[in-house]
Amino acid sequence: MVHLTGEEKAAVTGLWGKVNVDEVGGEALGRLLVVYPWTQRFFDSFGDLSNAGAVMGNAKVKAHGKKVLNAFGEGLKNLDNLKGTFAKLSELHCDKLHVDPENFRLLGNVLVVVLARHFGKDFTPPVQAAFQKLALGVATALAHKYH
């Protein structure tokens, strides 16, 4: 569960309605893989990830980024039950994929950077604070199975 004020919920849902999940998702995952290259080990089947250009242009990275953002959007619809919403994904990432749960926090932070880049002046400090809070809530829910 993430505790957002009414104002924070309005800011997050209002901006999220304008997010192009194809574009933002691919960019967020791509940036994660470039900025934190050790995360690439979970994406061996994605082909060429040898440099920033290859990563950012990789169709599989873009498709998976879209999938990730769609899941994030589901979390927005279920703010009072993030653990339940992400229970199956938490289990998958913990038991089968063995993803370090810190990567969820890193991805959330990268997502905030990408949103700031895309929305500029509309991504005010209060909007950023609300998204940081939400991203941490999602990361915590995804890490739940690890505890």
From Swiss-Prot:
Domain of life: Eukaryota
GO molecular-function term, one example from the UniProt record: organic acid binding
GO biological-process terms attached to the record: hydrogen peroxide catabolic process
PTM-bearing positions, type N-acetylvaline: 2
Phosphoserine carried by residues: 45
Pfam family, one: Globin
Protein name: Hemoglobin subunit beta-2
Organism: Chalinolobus morio
Gene name of the record: HBB2
